[in-house]
Protein backbone atom coordinates (compact mmCIF):
# COMPACT_ATOMS: atom_id res chain seq x y z
CA UNK A 1 0.00 0.00 0.00
CA UNK A 2 1.42 3.38 -1.02
CA UNK A 3 -0.21 6.79 -0.61
CA UNK A 4 -3.45 5.05 0.28
CA UNK A 5 -3.45 2.86 -2.83
CA UNK A 6 -3.42 -0.92 -2.61
CA UNK A 7 -0.95 -2.44 -5.04
CA UNK A 8 -0.79 -5.97 -3.68
CA UNK A 9 -3.16 -8.80 -4.38
CA UNK A 10 -4.60 -10.76 -1.44
CA UNK A 11 -2.45 -13.72 -0.46
CA UNK A 12 -2.71 -16.23 2.35
CA UNK A 13 -0.08 -18.84 3.02
CA UNK A 14 2.99 -19.87 4.99
CA UNK A 15 5.90 -17.43 5.03
CA UNK A 16 8.45 -19.96 6.25
CA UNK A 17 10.21 -20.18 2.89
CA UNK A 18 10.57 -16.40 2.29
CA UNK A 19 11.78 -15.99 5.87
CA UNK A 20 14.34 -18.78 5.63
CA UNK A 21 15.60 -17.95 2.15
CA UNK A 22 15.97 -14.17 2.52
CA UNK A 23 19.57 -13.07 3.04
CA UNK A 24 18.80 -9.60 4.39
CA UNK A 25 15.92 -7.17 4.96
CA UNK A 26 15.91 -5.94 1.36
CA UNK A 27 15.65 -9.49 0.07
CA UNK A 28 12.95 -10.29 2.64
CA UNK A 29 10.80 -7.33 1.58
CA UNK A 30 11.28 -8.26 -2.07
CA UNK A 31 10.11 -11.82 -1.40
CA UNK A 32 7.04 -10.58 0.49
CA UNK A 33 6.13 -8.27 -2.39
CA UNK A 34 6.62 -11.05 -4.91
CA UNK A 35 4.16 -13.42 -3.22
CA UNK A 36 1.64 -10.55 -3.34
CA UNK A 37 2.30 -10.13 -7.08
CA UNK A 38 4.04 -6.77 -6.73
CA UNK A 39 7.24 -6.12 -8.69
CA UNK A 40 9.85 -5.27 -6.01
CA UNK A 41 11.69 -3.00 -8.44
CA UNK A 42 8.61 -0.79 -8.81
CA UNK A 43 8.90 0.26 -5.15
CA UNK A 44 12.62 -0.28 -4.65
CA UNK A 45 13.20 3.04 -2.89
CA UNK A 46 9.90 3.34 -1.01
CA UNK A 47 9.87 3.13 2.80
CA UNK A 48 8.32 -0.08 4.12
CA UNK A 49 6.22 -0.50 7.25
CA UNK A 50 5.21 -4.03 8.22
CA UNK A 51 2.25 -4.15 10.62
CA UNK A 52 2.44 -7.66 12.03
CA UNK A 53 -0.56 -9.30 13.70
CA UNK A 54 1.20 -11.24 16.45
CA UNK A 55 2.92 -10.41 19.74
CA UNK A 56 6.44 -9.23 18.92
CA UNK A 57 7.86 -9.55 22.43
CA UNK A 58 7.32 -11.23 25.76
CA UNK A 59 6.80 -9.33 28.99
CA UNK A 60 9.80 -8.10 30.95
CA UNK A 61 8.56 -9.97 34.03
CA UNK A 62 8.33 -13.25 32.09
CA UNK A 63 11.85 -12.81 30.66
CA UNK A 64 13.26 -12.02 34.11
CA UNK A 65 11.52 -15.08 35.57
CA UNK A 66 13.06 -17.35 32.93
CA UNK A 67 16.53 -15.84 32.69
CA UNK A 68 17.20 -14.60 36.21
CA UNK A 69 14.70 -16.56 38.30
CA UNK A 70 13.32 -13.25 39.53
CA UNK A 71 9.68 -13.38 40.63
CA UNK A 72 7.16 -10.58 40.93
CA UNK A 73 5.75 -9.82 44.37
CA UNK A 74 2.28 -11.25 43.72
CA UNK A 75 0.05 -12.64 40.97
CA UNK A 76 -3.58 -11.57 40.90
CA UNK A 77 -6.12 -11.97 38.06
CA UNK A 78 -5.19 -13.22 34.61
CA UNK A 79 -5.56 -9.86 32.87
CA UNK A 80 -3.15 -8.21 35.31
CA UNK A 81 -0.65 -11.08 35.40
CA UNK A 82 2.69 -9.54 34.30
CA UNK A 83 4.01 -12.94 33.20
CA UNK A 84 1.13 -13.46 30.79
CA UNK A 85 0.59 -9.94 29.51
CA UNK A 86 2.84 -7.03 28.61
CA UNK A 87 2.21 -3.44 29.59
CA UNK A 88 0.63 -2.74 26.18
CA UNK A 89 -1.82 -5.62 26.59
CA UNK A 90 -2.78 -4.57 30.11
CA UNK A 91 -3.29 -1.05 28.72
CA UNK A 92 -5.85 -2.49 26.29
CA UNK A 93 -7.54 -4.62 28.97
CA UNK A 94 -8.11 -1.49 31.03
CA UNK A 95 -9.94 -0.02 28.03
CA UNK A 96 -12.23 -2.96 27.35
CA UNK A 97 -10.17 -4.75 24.70
CA UNK A 98 -9.05 -8.33 25.38
CA UNK A 99 -5.83 -9.23 23.54
CA UNK A 100 -4.44 -12.75 23.52
CA UNK A 101 -1.38 -13.84 25.48
CA UNK A 102 1.68 -15.25 23.75
CA UNK A 103 2.19 -17.40 26.87
CA UNK A 104 -1.24 -18.84 27.69
CA UNK A 105 -3.11 -18.69 24.38
CA UNK A 106 -2.54 -20.59 21.14
CA UNK A 107 -0.44 -17.90 19.45
CA UNK A 108 2.96 -18.73 20.92
CA UNK A 109 4.21 -20.29 17.69
CA UNK A 110 3.25 -17.22 15.65
CA UNK A 111 4.78 -14.94 18.27
CA UNK A 112 8.13 -16.72 18.12
CA UNK A 113 8.04 -16.51 14.32
CA UNK A 114 7.36 -12.77 14.49
CA UNK A 115 10.17 -12.23 17.01
CA UNK A 116 12.46 -14.33 14.78
CA UNK A 117 11.63 -12.07 11.82
CA UNK A 118 12.52 -8.99 13.86
CA UNK A 119 15.81 -10.51 15.00
CA UNK A 120 16.79 -11.32 11.42
CA UNK A 121 15.51 -8.36 9.45
CA UNK A 122 14.65 -5.48 11.83
CA UNK A 123 16.77 -6.00 14.94
CA UNK A 124 17.11 -2.38 16.02
CA UNK A 125 14.62 -0.77 18.42
CA UNK A 126 13.98 2.70 17.03
CA UNK A 127 11.49 3.54 19.79
CA UNK A 128 9.03 1.60 21.91
CA UNK A 129 7.04 -0.59 19.52
CA UNK A 130 9.11 0.29 16.45
CA UNK A 131 11.77 -2.05 15.09
CA UNK A 132 13.92 -1.24 12.08
CA UNK A 133 16.82 -2.33 9.89
CA UNK A 134 18.26 1.22 10.11
CA UNK A 135 17.27 1.56 6.48
CA UNK A 136 13.92 1.54 4.71
CA UNK A 137 12.17 -1.15 6.81
CA UNK A 138 10.23 -0.58 10.02
CA UNK A 139 8.02 -3.12 11.77
CA UNK A 140 5.22 -2.56 14.26
CA UNK A 141 2.69 -4.76 16.04
CA UNK A 142 -0.95 -4.62 14.98
CA UNK A 143 -4.15 -6.09 16.42
CA UNK A 144 -6.99 -5.95 13.86
CA UNK A 145 -9.69 -6.96 16.36
CA UNK A 146 -8.99 -3.81 18.36
CA UNK A 147 -9.89 -1.68 15.32
CA UNK A 148 -13.54 -2.73 15.10
CA UNK A 149 -14.87 0.34 16.92
CA UNK A 150 -12.60 2.82 15.14
CA UNK A 151 -14.36 5.31 12.87
CA UNK A 152 -10.95 6.18 11.40
CA UNK A 153 -10.43 2.59 10.31
CA UNK A 154 -14.02 2.28 9.07
CA UNK A 155 -13.52 5.35 6.87
CA UNK A 156 -10.32 3.92 5.39
CA UNK A 157 -11.90 0.52 4.81
CA UNK A 158 -14.78 2.07 2.87
CA UNK A 159 -12.22 3.16 0.28
CA UNK A 160 -11.61 -0.54 -0.41
CA UNK A 161 -14.98 -2.05 -1.40
CA UNK A 162 -13.13 -5.21 -2.43
CA UNK A 163 -12.74 -6.07 1.26
CA UNK A 164 -16.16 -7.72 1.11
CA UNK A 165 -14.95 -10.05 -1.63
CA UNK A 166 -11.97 -11.35 0.33
CA UNK A 167 -12.49 -15.03 0.97
CA UNK A 168 -10.93 -15.42 4.39
CA UNK A 169 -10.93 -13.43 7.62
CA UNK A 170 -7.12 -13.54 7.58
CA UNK A 171 -7.13 -11.59 4.31
CA UNK A 172 -9.47 -8.97 5.76
CA UNK A 173 -7.22 -8.72 8.81
CA UNK A 174 -4.24 -8.28 6.48
CA UNK A 175 -5.93 -5.28 4.84
CA UNK A 176 -6.60 -3.81 8.29
CA UNK A 177 -2.92 -4.29 9.14
CA UNK A 178 -1.92 -2.58 5.89
CA UNK A 179 -4.16 0.37 6.75
CA UNK A 180 -2.63 0.54 10.24
CA UNK A 181 0.81 0.64 8.64
CA UNK A 182 -0.41 3.48 6.39
CA UNK A 183 -1.71 5.39 9.43
CA UNK A 184 1.57 4.81 11.25
CA UNK A 185 3.55 6.28 8.36
CA UNK A 186 1.27 9.11 7.24
CA UNK A 187 -0.95 9.93 10.24
CA UNK A 188 0.74 8.68 13.42
CA UNK A 189 -1.31 11.09 15.51
CA UNK A 190 -4.37 8.95 14.77
CA UNK A 191 -2.82 6.02 16.66
CA UNK A 192 -2.59 5.50 20.41
CA UNK A 193 1.08 5.94 21.30
CA UNK A 194 3.09 4.42 24.17
CA UNK A 195 3.76 6.58 27.19
CA UNK A 196 7.13 6.90 28.92
CA UNK A 197 6.16 4.14 31.34
CA UNK A 198 5.96 1.53 28.55
CA UNK A 199 8.96 -0.85 28.71
CA UNK A 200 11.08 -0.32 25.61
CA UNK A 201 11.71 -3.98 24.85
CA UNK A 202 8.11 -5.12 25.38
CA UNK A 203 6.92 -3.29 22.28
CA UNK A 204 3.54 -1.70 21.74
CA UNK A 205 0.29 -2.67 20.01
CA UNK A 206 -0.65 0.18 17.70
CA UNK A 207 -4.41 0.75 17.44
CA UNK A 208 -6.42 3.78 16.28
CA UNK A 209 -6.88 6.19 19.17
CA UNK A 210 -10.60 6.44 18.47
CA UNK A 211 -10.97 2.68 19.03
CA UNK A 212 -10.37 3.29 22.73
CA UNK A 213 -12.88 4.75 25.21
Please give the residue ranges for each predicted region.
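RNase H-like (RuvC/DEDD) metal-dependent nuclease/polynucleotide-processing core
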Residues: 1-213
Amino acid sequence: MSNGKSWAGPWRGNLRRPINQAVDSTDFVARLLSVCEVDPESVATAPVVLAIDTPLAFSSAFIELLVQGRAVTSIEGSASNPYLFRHTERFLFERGISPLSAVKDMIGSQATKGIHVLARFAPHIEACGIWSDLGRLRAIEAYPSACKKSSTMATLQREYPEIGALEHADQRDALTCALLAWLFHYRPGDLAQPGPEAPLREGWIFVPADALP
